[in-house]
């Protein structure tokens, strides 16, 4: 069977062998707490490349030490990180996958000891510390940190950069009126709340000419928060700035009850793809080959991002191929076991 899931996809000169993407998922495995790649990362990510995932995106990687979600996160704030990341890139590419990295700053959701920063001095919840409101100098330094991270990612050999603007972390905190109470040019109107992300995109694009993704939370799940419709003009602006794909997730800007079910976020990706005319990635409880194929065949998204399913089964592409009646190449070492 000819499938879309196992057809190549080209984006800004990079051709992926299929439409399956491993979502960035924090592993919290830097036991040295210095942001360096560890043995776990060198096993975990290449295993999914062996499993025939087309694109693997490395977890949220801190552009500053304080920008990490936890002390056990990967980092890209120092040139000392480049060698380990370069080794990881080589291991993944050796097994036929493309590799990206998600550049991130946790903002008020950072659990690293010390001062935390955010657009406004508004805590995430009643049990969270109150962050320091960022000054203009803080904003400039953080934009520069994203650019420096992009430069290091390029030196390490990554194929794709994704900017993390979702899940209640720093960039998302600027975008949402629930967390951004500023009265200057970085707060208030939708245009002002987008300004920080816009500056990050421009700064990254100055040093990075490869495929650029942005992950968003397309719904705040709050009556006073943002909806997928609100993200359409943002996505149009991203496209104008040279973003190639919007990775569409949702939630986590404030504590909220979410109705979670298979494919629950796919309509957000579909709406943004249709109304902003930009490629999108769909993510969220996509578990079967037929489900992934339906999303692609019906033009609801361009790529399918898998998270927990690839934690359960590093060889999910093989299972999906069998389900769809498609034939894919097996690693030579596994040919005796991969039967179609």
From Swiss-Prot:
Keywords carried by this UniProt record: Detoxification, Flavoprotein, FMN, NADP, Oxidoreductase
Keyword hit for Lipid biosynthesis: no
Pfam families referenced in this protein's UniProt entry, alphabetically: Oxidored_FMN
Superkingdom in the source lineage: Bacteria
The reaction(s) this protein catalyses: A + NADPH + H(+) = AH2 + NADP(+)
Cofactor(s) the protein needs: FMN
Disulfide bonds: none
Keyword Flavoprotein tagged: yes
Enzyme Commission number(s) from the entry: 1.6.99.1
GO biological process: response to toxic substance
Xref: SUPFAM superfamilies: FMN-linked oxidoreductases
PANTHER family linked to this entry: NADPH DEHYDROGENASE C23G7.10C-RELATED (PTHR43303:SF4)
Similarity comment: family membership: Belongs to the NADH:flavin oxidoreductase/NADH oxidase family. NamA subfamily.
Subunit and interaction comment: Homotetramer.
Protein name: NADPH dehydrogenase
Organism: Geobacillus kaustophilus (strain HTA426)
């Amino acid at each position: 069977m000819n499938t879309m899931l196992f057809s190549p996809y080209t984006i800004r000169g990079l051709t992926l062998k299929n439409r399956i993407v491993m979502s960035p998922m924090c592993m919290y495995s830097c036991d040295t707490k210095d942001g360096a790649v560890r043995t776990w990362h060198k096993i975990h990510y290449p295993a999914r490349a062996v499993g025939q995932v087309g694109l693997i995106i490395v977890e949220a990687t801190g552009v500053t030490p304080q920008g990490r979600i936890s002390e056990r996160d990967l980092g890209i704030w120092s040139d000392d990180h480049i060698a380990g990341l370069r080794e990881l890139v080589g291991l993944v590419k050796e097994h036929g996958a493309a590799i990206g990295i998600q550049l991130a700053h946790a903002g008020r959701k950072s659990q690293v000891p010390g001062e935390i920063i955010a657009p406004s001095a508004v805590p995430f919840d009643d049990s969270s510390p109150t962050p320091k409101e960022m000054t203009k100098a803080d904003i400039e330094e953080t934009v520069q940190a994203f650019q420096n991270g992009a430069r290091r990612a390029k030196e390490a050999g990554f194929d794709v950069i994704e900017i993390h603007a979702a899940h209640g972390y720093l960039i998302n905190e600027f975008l949402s009126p629930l967390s951004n109470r500023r009265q200057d040019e970085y707060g208030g109107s939708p245009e002002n709340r987008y300004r920080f992300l816009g500056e990050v995109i421009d700064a990254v694009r100055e040093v990075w000419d490869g495929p650029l993704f942005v992950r968003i939370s397309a719904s705040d799940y709050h009556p006073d928060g943002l909806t997928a419709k609100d993200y359409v003009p943002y996505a149009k602006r991203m496209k104008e700035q040279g973003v190639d794909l919007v990775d569409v997730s949702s939630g986590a800007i404030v504590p909220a009850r979410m109705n979670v079910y298979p494919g629950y976020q796919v309509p957000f990706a579909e709406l943004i793809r249709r109304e902003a005319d930009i490629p999108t990635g769909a993510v969220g409880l996509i578990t079967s080959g037929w489900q992934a194929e339906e999303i692609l065949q019906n033009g609801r998204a361009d790529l399918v991002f898998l998270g927990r399913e690839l934690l359960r089964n590093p060889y999910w592409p093989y299972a999906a191929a069998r389900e769809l009646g498609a034939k894919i190449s097996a690693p030579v070492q596994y040919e005796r076991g991969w039967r179609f």
